[in-house]
């Protein structure tokens, strides 16, 4: 991964990946961020584990049987803005994304393996909501296809702007999507509708001058 980032001179977000936990038989579900020089710029361990029942061929999902949750949110500073890291089921917990926004995120990253059932119903509405309420770009890459044990994932990887508009979307297949992120557009939206300044349930949040 480091070599790919270095050879192509890109920022690379690799997630999610299983990573070892010292003293634990279980693993973390993690995202790793590499800079264009190949250096590891930061990592995030998934906070919210998917222990749910879904009306699909798999039925019972118990992520905690194999994984332990992380303890800390993460924003990575880059030349094009802060990258707020999250993974899959995290997207159902808006308080995480508000924290990422308050910590300087302008792009929210959501690598995922949303099931076909939950994805068809909730994938796009949840992602658009996180983009709109936090006035951030959202880049969400979702697994697709039929897997073992009756599991099927939704695909439809997507890029969304801070106004909630879909800039690019894949279908239920493997593919490549891209979109241009406009810092001035993001700045204008935050200026015109300063939601952090209006938030009353948490104190001390102000839009940077």
Roles of regions detected by a PLM:
Residues 50-58, 176-178, 183-188:
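Short, surface-exposed linear segments at secondary-structure transitions and domain or protein termini
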Residues 3, 22-103, 116-119, 125, ...:
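Active-site catalytic loop in hydrolytic enzyme cores
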Residues 14-16, 30-33, 74-76, 157-159, ...:
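Short beta-strand scaffold segments in enzyme catalytic cores
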Residues 36-39, 79, 162-164, 181-184:
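Short loop segments at secondary-structure junctions
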Residues 19-22, 146:
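Short glycine/acidic-enriched loop and turn motifs that connect beta-strands
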Residues 184-209:
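A short C-terminal boundary segment appended to hydrolase-like catalytic domains
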Residues 17, 45, 143:
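Histidine-centered beta-alpha loop that forms part of the nucleotide-sugar donor binding/catalytic region
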Residues 1-14, 82, 88-177:
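CN hydrolase (nitrilase-like) catalytic-core segments centered on the catalytic cysteine
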């Amino acid at each position: 991964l480091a070599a790919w980032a270095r050879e192509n001179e890109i920022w690379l977000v690799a997630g999610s990946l299983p990573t070892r936990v010292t003293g634990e038989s279980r693993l973390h579900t993690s995202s790793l961020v590499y800079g264009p020089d190949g250096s590891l710029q930061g990592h995030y361990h998934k906070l919210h584990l998917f222990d749910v029942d879904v009306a699909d061929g798999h039925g019972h999902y118990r992520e905690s049987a194999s994984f332990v949750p992380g303890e800390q949110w993460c924003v990575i500073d880059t030349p094009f803005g802060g990258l707020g890291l999250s993974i899959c089921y995290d997207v159902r917990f808006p308080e995480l994304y508000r924290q990422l926004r308050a910590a300087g995120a302008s792009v929210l990253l959501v690598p995922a393996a949303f099931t076909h059932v939950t994805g068809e119903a909730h994938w796009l509405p949840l992602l658009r909501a996180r983009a709109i309420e936090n006035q951030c770009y959202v880049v969400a890459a979702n697994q697709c296809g039929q897997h073992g044990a009756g599991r099927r994932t939704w695909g439809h990887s997507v890029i969304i702007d801070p106004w909630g508009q879909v800039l690019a979307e894949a279908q239920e297949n493997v593919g490549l999507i891209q979109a241009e992120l406009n810092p001035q557009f993001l700045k204008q939206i935050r200026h015109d509708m300063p939601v952090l300044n209006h938030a009353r349930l948490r104190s001390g949040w102000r839009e940077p001058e």
